[in-house]
């Protein structure tokens, strides 16, 4: 029986392109050569290709998600999406894969388009009793809002960030009114919508979850202590942060975070691995920051840390997700 052929899809069209490549390298190293044949698939605006060796890439046929190698036509059996941003995190790639009948590791088009829009996703989850921060959304018609009106409504300090996207790119902490319009302009440079959110004080934590045999497994909680003003791109990827797994919180708080994460997973009808970020405020209740459906997967990323803390094996977690996805289509 031939080994299933898995595409680890990376790249994409956003500012998180380089992060995606690092995540893909991590996934490929964990998967190894057994029990699947895994290839890196690179998606660029002008080219989709398959890396068949360190020095060689061949074109990917978008008609059926296949490629030619040594006079043999090879069609992928499964897609492991690790694109951070468009088109892998907003439902576009999922729709394409659905059309050609290739199973994949994330939620479907509806789930991904919902979770990619931070404002809409948080509002949706708040309807089920999940606490969220006070926030508002600006569209392209609101590039020059009334600063006095906005600060009177939201107060200061605030966070201003693109409403879609991740890695805290173009995110600004605004502590005085004069900083607001430049921050909004910077956020609009990364997308067509901007989210403005009230600053929340407390302990920042994050918790991953995945589905194993139709049961949601919530991983140990990580505490995030940023050495910068907040957990920005520099903190995430240049080491300006302390990540403590398991988090230095009570057992009760840990159980609450894990229960909330599992519930969010189920409410969203998620698949694969997700990560949910929170702030635990002074009253002990977690406030949702955002849901990430294609979290970073480098060896030092949160999810691998949490898997190790749970005394699980990263390869086995990935293989479980892929096997379950393949079995659903058989």
Curated annotation (Swiss-Prot):
Instruction: Tell me what reaction this enzyme catalyses.
Output: 2 D-alanine + ATP = D-alanyl-D-alanine + ADP + phosphate + H(+)
Q: Which domain of life is it from?
A: Bacteria
Entry EC no(s): 6.3.2.4
Supply one GO CC term from the record. Answer: cytoplasm
Question: Which pathway is it part of?
Answer: Cell wall biogenesis; peptidoglycan biosynthesis
Q: Does the keyword Iron-sulfur apply?
A: no
Q: What is this protein called?
A: D-alanine--D-alanine ligase
